[in-house]
């Protein structure tokens, strides 16, 4: 019997660390607290423009598009995921908040257990983070994996089985460290 408990304890000790991790989408409200506290200037703000995706295939470069005005016109909404942020911006937020970005593998391991609505197929707009599965709302920036390219996870409202397959784990989409877009945000790991 002792042997059984010892083996059981070893099994529990070796089980996935992801069970103790929570993946939280960073909202506009969260990001605003960071900006207000640190006076950080995002890559999109430095450049004075960013990419605004209009559908899965088309985009525009829009002056004034940044996390405060993702489409360059309308104010962002506190309860929505922050968008128009780059990898660089996500890293600075993570340092400030003393958290970290998930790896691509951690991201998928955690979201596999989330059974809330997946927003994609252009059926819904980007929705408040508390109401939906992280997958399919906005692309999430993940931690670098021995590369200068940033792998995005989870897909966005523009993805579907017929287009970019973003909500599929084996989909590969990379951007550089300075790229933001109206449907790119980030989530953080909370232990």
Language model segments and positions:
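Sec-dependent N-terminal signal peptides
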Residues: 3-12
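Disulfide-stabilized, aromatic/cysteine-rich ligand-recognition loop
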Residues: 14-18, 26-33, 80-88, 99, ...
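Active-site microenvironments of metalloenzymes and redox enzymes
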Residues: 18-114, 191
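Residue-level detector of short, conserved catalytic/binding motifs and their immediate flanks
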Residues: 19, 129, 134-139, 150, ...
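Short, solvent-exposed loop/turn segments at the edges of secondary structure
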Residues: 62, 134, 181-183
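Short coil/loop residues immediately preceding or within conserved phosphate-binding loops
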Residues: 77, 126, 183
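Short, well-ordered junction/capping motifs at the entry into regular secondary structure
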Residues: 113-135
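Short beta->alpha transition motifs characteristic of CBS
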Residues: 140-146
